[in-house]
Amino acid sequence: MTDKELKRSVLTVTAFASFLTPFMGSSVNLALPSIGNEFGVNAVTLNWIVSSYMLSTSVLLLPAGRVGDILGRKKIFTAGLVIFTLTMILLTFTPNIKWLIGARVIQGLGSAMLFATNLAILTSVFPPGERGRAMGINVTAVYIGLSSGPFLGGLLTRYLGWRSIFAFLVPMGIISLILIRTKMKEEWAEAKGETFDWQGAVIYGFSLAAIMFGFSKLPSAAGWAITASGLILMPLFVMREKRTKYPLFDITLISKNRVFAFSNLAALIHYAATSAIGFFLSLYLQYIKELGPRDAGFVLMCWPLTMALISPAAGKLSDRQNPGVL
């Protein structure tokens, strides 16, 4: 396989996989009222359908990326896609809300493995001068998933029921696995032979889980206590990573690399400001404004559709202009 063919194959596979998780997320947000009506649960319980997935993904994202560096990014990427697809089958036939939330936790593991290795594979294949365009295409796939999710998810929910959203994604996951098997022949393991920092991973996982779970319980006393315990563990994680030879996360990237630090800060602000919109706006449009899933989907698809249209040009332009200015 030539270098050009490898780049095309990797970009196709990663973009296809990048479409799946945001499509699922935006579709599920739209289906929440229908899920609540079927299982007879309130908005607090419905929130755990989203939060359980996000919590699992967040806690496992960093360890999954490190394991990918050691064992091979393609292996972790493939395993993540297998888990993600299998949980879609479980979610299609879920009998109750507990089963649904549990399957979403497992699905978060698969999603973490996909997210942690997706862009890492791209940066391993594409040189610096071509990465902006490649990442722009990849991000476009993400926002196509976000924008088409409300529309198609609304149609599926209205005419076939909310379970059809998960069933719809099963063949797409299988197609992605076939593409990996036939098109992605290389493997990337830049930290092969290094050890995995299990202690750091445990501290990091408990810290982040406590912070996120504690926030969900605020302003109760238990919520403050759980959040405080998570915040206390975070400095311990930093000290652990500074001492170990092969850290889970290189802390010096934040202190010495301003571009890395501020780009991640910008991403944090962006996603913190927008991640809750899909959840609350979906409930507002369908419960308060009494819109159907299809019409609510049209409203929810506007902002990600705009991003999907702009991302390719922005990525290509970042190869020529200062990304900081953009």
Ranges and model annotations:
Residues 1-182, 302, 310-326:
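Transmembrane-helix bundle of Major Facilitator Superfamily
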Residues 9-20, 28-30, 160, 222-223, ...:
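12-transmembrane solute porter fold
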Residues 44, 204, 294:
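Rossmann-like NAD(H)/NADP(H) cofactor-binding core
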Residues 158-265, 270:
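Hydrophobic transmembrane-helix bundles of small-molecule transporters
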